[in-house]
Amino acid sequence: MAGFFRNAPRDVGSFVLIVAAVGFGSGFAGGQAVAAAGGPFLAHQALYELSLVKSRGSNSINGARGRILYNFSGSACEGYTSEFRQVSELDSGEGKVTLSDLRSTSWEDGAGKSYRFKIDTRMNDAESSPVDGVAERAGDHINVKLKQPVSKTFTLDGTTVFPTEQIQRIIAAAREGKTVLELTVYDGSDNGEKIYNTLSVIGQPIPGDRTIAAPDPSTSSGVMKSLTRWPVTVSYYDRDAKAKDGEQTPVYAMSFELYENGVSRALVLDYNDFVISGAMGKFDVKDSKPCK
């Protein structure tokens, strides 16, 4: 899901990653990522309850609440489908409350060569802001065709990855004992033209039998109990922004515990001026067809 949280406002504008943020991965070109990650991703539905952890800076807020509903399904054979909805309410004080409703659907093929996405954002009573497009790998570059918000075609460097591949590579790096991973990511967020440089910091593995201080539906699931997970923090940087004094501040950072089957728990979303937690409130495993 990591890709769909990126529209979250630092100025209490449109709230949402991603994925997403919380992002959930897929294979990259040639199917190497699937083998590297050591197993298929789990088809599932997860509900996250959002709440304000702390507020700071000039654009601080008084309160925040909301929910994220995330559905993930598919396989390396048929591709991966993600459905995401986030409804959030931000209170910036003096009676100013911003209500946002973001819905997105995406499909990414198992080889990481094709990515289709539709994103719709509504703010208060304003009209929706749809983004609709497709990205296809072609040799050493990626061709992007947008239908909305405007009809447009442009190219990206071939080293850029899509959201599912991003998570797949993080899992592969974690299995190899790596602690840092840099990737350039495209997920169609914002106006469909934004590209992000990401820095993932991976902590030590957490075995499935370790006692959990704050359990949730994923940790009590029989499917999940024996699985290893890793604490991960992914920072997203605007590729077009200029660094100040040699350093660049991330647009936002997302921390979470990432299971080896792609499920994420214990979300913490840091938007610089405020921090929001996403506690898993519900978790359901979905039926899926094995890859033949």
Regions found by a protein language model. Give the residues of each.
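N-terminal cleavable signal peptides for secretion/export
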Residues: 31-79, 83-97, 291
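A short, structured loop/turn motif at beta-sheet edges
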Residues: 37-43, 71-80, 107-113, 223-227, ...
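Bacterial N-terminal signal peptides that target proteins for export
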Residues: 2-17, 26-27
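C-terminal segment of classical bacterial N-terminal signal peptides
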Residues: 22-32
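Hydrophobic/aromatic beta-strand elements that line small-molecule binding cavities or substrate pockets
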Residues: 66-73, 101-108, 133-135, 254-257
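Mature, soluble, non-transmembrane domains
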Residues: 120-292
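Hydrophobic/aromatic-rich structural module bridging two neighboring secondary-structure elements via a short loop
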Residues: 84-137
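Short beta-strand segments that buttress and anchor functional surface loops
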Residues: 48-53, 84-89, 117-122, 232-241
